[in-house]
């Protein structure tokens, strides 16, 4: 049976383009197009769509307010349609917090041509989002108790990779890490501009100092670096330190940044000093790199199916034998810290 889709967007052009894109796929069935939240509400009651594409910025009732009401009254998988602006990226991150599963960024210029170029991605994301497991909105995790022996060390590195559903999963893991945590490197599939807003949001919410990575940044205790959109992030050893290197080489597994690029570079230079987790996401990116880390002596884990929004990347890792542990999201931070303590303190600062 085809997946039923409702399009909610105030732009007649976007509605028309999405209609054309959706109707070109026999696995998708368009049940309606709404110019605002009020028309959408009536269509949802009438058709109970499997997935909704929702514009962030709309008149009468903005997309975030509507999303908040929808998730409380009738939780439904939602794909956000966002503008590639700083305001748009902030709103999109808030939408993911409120329960949206994923997003597509509208091109800045040439919307008709740009949307058609993304047609396959839009159709694929609608199908993935429709099948996604909706997570109940949870309160922020309590701060972990401070350890008597701080984990300040330039040796240990926590590496995290994620895709669909990853912004909230990564937030939960980082909320579970103390200010004296080993340095953290993160690759989350996300376009340019969004990664900076994502890093700034994590910096405000967690006890770590979080920033978008710049080429040559050192990996330091209590700091987390997020791979910038459209750049691969590798890690290299530099004397007693680890530094990140950015490049714009070809996409890997259809992504730039790719988790495999980060994980495989870490396997080469850090080995036993690594604590790596592969979180929720579609596809297989990161599984091969996680296996390389395990083979190099690092600790590896994958998020379990029950707590993943999309159990794709972690499933691939488990099937490859790459994950030493398979854990629910709420236990991942504690497991990483426990393994860091077991593996010794390294070079204390």
From Swiss-Prot:
Supply the Gene3D superfamilies for this chain. 3.40.50.2300, Methylesterase CheB, C-terminal domain
The alphabetized UniProt keywords are: Chemotaxis, Cytoplasm, Hydrolase, Phosphoprotein
| EC number(s) from the headed UniProt entry | 3.1.1.61, 3.5.1.44
Instruction: Output one GO BP term.
Output: chemotaxis
The UniProt record lists the CheB-type methylesterase domain at: 151-343
Q: Which GO terms describe its molecular function?
A: phosphorelay response regulator activity; protein-glutamate methylesterase activity; protein-glutamine glutaminase activity
InterPro entries tied to this protein: CheB-like (IPR008248), CheB_C (IPR035909), CheY-like_superfamily (IPR011006), Sig_transdc_resp-reg_Me-estase (IPR000673), Sig_transdc_resp-reg_receiver (IPR001789)
Tell me if Lipid biosynthesis is a UniProt keyword of this record: no
* Summary of the knockout phenotype: Mutant is defective in chemotaxis, but does not have an obvious defect in swimming behavior. Mutant shows strongly reduced adherence to a biological surface such as the human epithelial cell line, and a reduction in swimming motility. Also shows a highly attenuated virulence in C.elegans and in a murine lung infection model, and fails to induce strong inflammatory response in the infected mice lungs.
Catalytic residue positions:
163, 189, 285
Quaternary state and partners of this protein?
Interacts with the C-terminal pentapeptide GWEEF of McpB.
Q: Any further remarks?
A: This protein is able to restore chemotaxis to a completely non-chemotactic CheB1 mutant to near wild-type levels.
Function summary? Involved in chemotaxis. Part of a chemotaxis signal transduction system that modulates chemotaxis in response to various stimuli. Catalyzes the demethylation of specific methylglutamate residues introduced into the chemoreceptors (methyl-accepting chemotaxis proteins or MCP) by CheR. Also mediates the irreversible deamidation of specific glutamine residues to glutamic acid. Acts on the methyl-accepting chemotaxis protein McpB. May be involved in a specific chemotactic response, which takes place during infection and is required for P.aeruginosa pathogenicity.
What is the recorded name of this protein? Answer: Protein-glutamate methylesterase/protein-glutamine glutaminase 2
What does the record give as the organism's lineage?
Bacteria, Pseudomonadati, Pseudomonadota, Gammaproteobacteria, Pseudomonadales
- Which gene codes for it? cheB2
